[in-house]
Design a protein with these regions (language model features):
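Sec-dependent N-terminal signal peptides
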Residues: 20-29
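Intrinsically disordered, low-complexity segments
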Residues: 11-13, 29, 74
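Cysteine endopeptidase catalytic domains of the caspase/legumain-like
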Residues: 2, 23, 34-306
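A composition/secondary-structure signal for short, hydrophobic, low-basic-content segments
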Residues: 8, 31-34
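N-terminal secretory signal peptides that target proteins for export/translocation
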Residues: 1-18
Length: 306
């Protein structure tokens, strides 16, 4: 009789525990199971000016891109972090990328946007076929190599960015998605226009950052889509770039404000399209850029893992 009573109590206890477990799971926030959306937006307009003018970057309007895109992405459910002007130092960008790689989870979506100047950097490691790395220019990166003054430590090299992207893609896994937008340029002339006119604002420089004094000659690659390496356990990667390596990225004026053309047309597309695993929106952006007669000399480039 005692044994039967004991067994009955065990069954009742197990049943109660199971019900409690189900109740706890039901009470857990739905967000723990849903895909999380993360966005890091970096945009620089006003770079520091140095005594040596060749070390300084011209004024552009990268911060406008961030202000344009931030509310749109927030409305789509993204947790948005922004870094603009003085806050967009190399250290700050690196810190945000590292944090992103540590906080994302399997199945998450990540959107990274970089708006500012770009520059080709002489490849010291020897991993680039053409002898040049590509770099995004944070707020505290100078344009000119100067021994014992500035040697490029604040340039955000493509090698460095790719390391963080690999970590993020591995963390979110094959069910996640990673988008990267680079509204910069590595072949511009950095012409400084007047704020109250329709003067040309160009992102980037045609002067390579070189320790040896090497002259930069951009590689002529007319491909519009480039395949990047991947692994089965990694999230798909789609990287959008404002122009080909030998072209100039010219800002456009809309409603009395200047924007990077890639950023502007992404914002217009995302007013009606929701970022997801469906990548049709990318080609819609390309078509919008191609239709703009102000941009006939630049062509959007995509790099993708599939």
């Amino acid at each position: 009789m005692a044994v039967n009573t004991y067994n009955l109590l065990r069954k009742q206890s197990s049943s109660i525990m199971m019900r409690l477990l189900v109740l706890v799971l039901l009470l857990l926030p739905i967000s723990l199971f849903a895909q999380q959306k993360h966005a890091l937006l970096v945009g620089i307009s006003d770079y520091p000016q140095y005594k040596i003018s060749d070390a300084s970057w011209s004024r552009i309007h990268g911060a406008n891109d961030v202000r344009l895109l931030s509310p749109i992405l927030s409305k789509q459910g993204f947790k948005v972090e922004t870094l603009t002007d003085k806050s967009a130092t190399h250290k700050a960008i690196e810190k945000s990328l590292k944090k992103l790689s540590q906080t994302v989870h399997s199945g998450d979506m990540v959107y990274i946007h970089l708006s500012g100047h770009g520059q080709a950097v002489e490849d010291i490691s020897g991993d680039e076929d053409d002898g040049w790395d590509e770099a995004f220019i944070p707020y505290d990166a100078q344009r000119l190599y100067q021994k014992d003054i500035y040697t490029g430590n604040n340039h955000l090299l493509d090698d460095e960015l790719n390391q963080y992207l690999d970590a993020i893609r591995t963390k979110v896994g094959a069910t996640g998605m990673v988008y990267v937008v680079i509204d910069a340029c590595h072949a511009g002339s950095s012409y400084r226009g007047e704020e109250d006119t329709d003067s040309v604002y160009v992102r980037g420089t045609d002067i390579g950052f070189s320790q040896s004094g090497k002259t930069y000659a951009p590689k002529i690659d007319k491909r519009g889509n480039i395949r990047v390496t991947s692994r089965p356990d990694m999230a798909p990667l789609y990287m959008l770039e404002a122009c080909r390596s030998y072209e100039v990225n010219t800002e456009i004026k809309q409603e009395n404000l200047f924007y990077g053309p890639l950023s502007y047309y992404i914002s217009q597309e995302l007013l009606t399209s929701t970022l997801s695993t469906d990548t049709n929106w990318i080609e819609n952006v390309r078509k919008k850029i191609d239709k703009d007669t102000r941009l006939i000399r630049q062509h959007m480039v995509t790099e993708s893992s599939r």
